[in-house]
Amino acid sequence: MAAKYITIAREIKKRIITQQYAANEPLPDQFALAVEFSTSRMTIQQAMRQLIVEGLVYTRQGQGTFIRKNFLQLSQWDLSGSDYFGATKTWEHLGTMTSQVVHFELRFPNEKEQASLMINPDTPIYDFIRLRLLNGEPMSLDATVMPLNLVPGLNKTHLESSVFRYVQETLGLKIMGSYRVVRALKPSALDMQHLVCEPTDPVLEVEQVIYLEDGTPLEYAHCHYRYDHGGIVIVNNG
C-alpha cells in the first residue's frame, strides 16, 4: 500500500483537477482534513508538502493553502518532475489508461543498469517496453528494467494494468523518491512506430531511477514522449 499521505495527496489532487476546490478559495484547513481522512495533522502536512512540490498549491503565512491559479491551464499531458506515482495514477483522472506490451524478457544487466540499480552482473532483471495510451491515444513509450528479486512474480497481466499497483498493493513495497534526467532526442524506429511520429519530430526522454523508502533502486527506465504532448513541470518553491 502507498503511504497514507500519498493517498491523501492523490485524493486532494483529484478534487483540485475536477474543481471541487475553487482556485480562488483556500483549501480546507489541516484540522478539518485530518478529521475527514481520519489521520493526524502531521500526515496532512506531509500530503500538503507533496502537493507543493508538484506545483499544485502554495501557502500564505497565516492565511492557509491555496491552489495555484495557472495549474488548470497546464496540458493534460504535463506531469510533475517530482511525480513517482506511475502513469496509471498520474493520468487516470483524465480517462482510461491502457498499456500495450511491446517487449518482455528476463535477462542479466549491462554495466549501466548495474550502476543505476546498484546490482551485481549476475542479478536477473525484467526488461520490458510498454506503450502507454490515454483514451486510446499514444502517450509514452517506456523501456524499463527491474531486479527480479525485488519484484517476484511480475507477469504480462501486471504490465498491461499497473506495475506500481502490484509493487505497492500486492508486494507491500513503498516508493519514496526518484532521480530524473530530461532531454530531447531524435525518435528511434520504435518511437516512430508506436508514438506515430516523423523522423524529424523530437521526442522528450525522461531517464529515471525510482527508489524504495530505504533507498534501494526499484526501477531504471527511459520514457519517451511526443514533443506535442506537453512537458515536464519543474516547480521551485524556494
Where are these regions (language model features)?
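Residues in the helix-turn-helix
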Residues: 43
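HTH-adjacent hinge/linker in prokaryotic transcriptional regulators
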Residues: 4-8, 18, 22, 26, ...
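Helix-turn-helix DNA-binding elements, focusing on the entry/boundary residues of the two helices
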Residues: 30
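C-terminal all-alpha effector/ligand-binding and dimerization domain
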Residues: 96-238
